[in-house]
Structure formats: structure tokens, C-alpha cells
Amino acid sequence: MSNKDIRVVVGMSGGVDSSVTAHVLKEQGYDVIGIFMKNWDDTDENGVCTATEDYNDVIEVCNQIGIPYYAVNFEKEYWDKVFTYFLDEYKKGRTPNPDVMCNKEIKFKAFLDHAMNLGADYVATGHYARIHRHEDGHVEMLRGVDNNKDQTYFLNQLSQQQLSKVMFPIGDIEKSEVRRIAEEQGLVTAKKKDSTGICFIGEKNFKTFLSQYLPAQPGDMITLDGKKMGKHSGLMYYTIGQRHGLGIGGDGDPWFVVGKNLKDNVLYVEQGFHHDALYSDYLIASDYSFVNPEDNDLDQGFECTAKFRYRQKDTKVFVKRENDHALRVTFAEPVRAITPGQAVVFYQGDVCLGGATIDDVFKNEGQLNFVV
């Protein structure tokens, strides 16, 4: 089958990465369709909807490239599957990663299903990751070549079935090259800045946004031995290892968040970047997913490396099943400020094995106060 007989539906955001993705596939001769996903009603205070601006850029790029385009609305699915989860996690005192859930439930489920109904053979996105297809049909996901932009961390929940229908055309080139291609082709998005922050918050103030949905409950900020250091404005506004916004003055080392007590509405703080309370030896994680589950013996356990947050250096770990629903991940050396609600993502070299959601964090001598 030649490329012209293979239909690829590209998820287009109005940014440079997805624009170049569509261009590359068109140049390679595929039957390309561009689709813009509207996942959030983001009309700002002035009545301007940034999604409309982004869709206008998609239209212009698709016209430049010469491919058809459509828009699809997933606002309900996004609210039900991503935003509700986001709020529930904050209510539990955790720090969620909505991008992971958005990829799992929207971009590579709702959007993938929609594309297949349009007769797509594959979907493609502008993610910095790579797919390796083996002769027997199974696939592996590899880190993007641009180490600074690699996005496998956010794709860790994707299954073999999902990845078998996915292309990441820019995963094997550097971001600077993506910009160069866009400029060379005169694409309107060539100099558009990258989006930052959580997709549905955009440039809004995080505290202000969250307070619209969850009532803040101020409480005491204390040290682990009970010394009161001030007031916090609501546990949901703080994450483990956070330094800024505590409002603790005085001399000496800066102060950091080392834990939360939901029952008593207490925020624990301690002084010093390397305070012992910030370090842990192992974690328990649930909702685990592996691209190739049969390759990993969870009962015997296996060694690999892991990331506990985006753009973090890999840490050597040992992964083993804790029970029917959870994994125990033991670190080769203590790790600082691991945060419940975030993803732990596993690697063998460049291959992303999968990931899980961090639930509880421990020192060898017992559970930490991270979220209790």
C-alpha cells in the first residue's frame, strides 16, 4: 500500500509542532486531514476565545499545506474525564497531572475513535516521542530525540492498542529544526510561542482559577515538631517541595512544604532545601499501565529507571507488584520531593515502558507526611 492510500488524521492545536507534523506527512504523500479539538470553553474576561484564534491558525496552515480540516468539540468528554479528575485530586490534597489524563482519555481515545470513524488508518500529533514498530506488529514508544522536549512522560498511560494507531512525525527531530521547517514553508505558526501551563487554565492565575471551583480553607502552617510558622491559604494551593508563596521571613535557609494533613487542615513546613523530611526511599503507585505488559515480570520485579516529574533526570529503581492494584517502586538512592498525584514513568534506555500514579511516599522507617 502506498502512502497516498493511507489516511492520517492530525490533531492540530494551532501551534507550530502540529503544523509541521501535518506538513511532514503531506510531503511524505499521505492522505492527510487536520482536526482541531475544542476541549474547553476558554472565553476570557474580554469575551475573546483563544480557541477561535487557534482554530483560525489551523485553517490558515491547512490551506497553506493543501489539506482538508474540521473542528470537533470534546468539551463534555474533557469535563467528565479530565477536569472532574483534576478537581477530585486537589480535594484529596494531591497534585494531579491533567496532561497525562488528557492524552489517555481525549487525544488518544475520544479523538482516536473520532478519527477512525472518518476512515483514518492512523492519527498523528505533534508530540516529541517516537514509535518503533516491530515486524510482528507490536510497538514500543521511545523518547523524542530532542531530550529537552521529550514528552513520553505525559504519554505514559497509552496502551499497545492506542500506540499501534499513532504516528509522531516530529519525534526524531529537534525543536529548532521544527521551527526552521515552519519558517522555510512560510507557515503562519512558525514564530508562535509554545503554550505553557495546564491547557484549560492557559495564562490565568492558578489560585484564582482553582478558587472558582473549590472553596479555599485557610489553616495553620507548622513545623513537624509543632511550631506555628503562619497561615496557609488552602492546602490545594501547595505542592511538596514548594518554596515560593509561604510568606515565612527571617534569616537562614529558605522554607519548603514537606507535607499536608487534610484532617486537621495543616500545612507542614521545614527549613532547608535538603531537609530530611523531603527525601524518601520508595513509593506506592496505582493505575499502572505498561505498553507491553508481558515484557515486565511484576511478581519477580525488575530494574529500570524512572522519572517522578517532567524534565527530571532518570533515577535507578526496582519495580515490583505490591498488590492487585498497586506497585512498589524502590529507589537506588533517596529522592527529593516526590509528589502524590503525579506520574512515575518507567524507562529502559530510550524505551518508555509505561507509568503509574504516585499514591504514598515512604522512608524505610515509615510513611512520610506528604499527604495524610
Swiss-Prot record:
Catalytic residue list: C102, C199
Recorded GO MF terms: ATP binding; tRNA binding; tRNA-uridine 2-sulfurtransferase activity
Major enzyme class: transferase
An example Gene Ontology CC term for this record: cytoplasm
Pfam families listed in its UniProt record: tRNA_Me_trans (PF03054), tRNA_Me_trans_C (PF20258), tRNA_Me_trans_M (PF20259)
Highest taxon of source: Bacteria
Site (Interaction with tRNA): H127, Q342
Catalytic activity: S-sulfanyl-L-cysteinyl-[protein] + uridine(34) in tRNA + AH2 + ATP = 2-thiouridine(34) in tRNA + L-cysteinyl-[protein] + A + AMP + diphosphate + H(+)
Sequence positions that bind ATP: G11, M12, S13, G14, G15, V16, D17, S18, M37, G126
GO biological process, any: tRNA wobble position uridine thiolation
Stretches that traverse the bilayer: none
Disulfide bond positions: C102-C199
Compartments (UniProt record): Cytoplasm
Enzyme Commission number(s) from the entry: 2.8.1.13
Keywords from the UniProt entry: ATP-binding, Cytoplasm, Disulfide bond, Nucleotide-binding, RNA-binding, Transferase, tRNA processing, tRNA-binding
Region Interaction with tRNA, residue ranges: 149-151, 309-310
Annotated region described as Interaction with target base in tRNA, given as residue ranges: 97-99
Family statement drawn from the similarity comment of this UniProt entry: Belongs to the MnmA/TRMU family.
Function: Catalyzes the 2-thiolation of uridine at the wobble position (U34) of tRNA, leading to the formation of s(2)U34.
Name of the protein in question: tRNA-specific 2-thiouridylase MnmA
Chain's gene name: mnmA
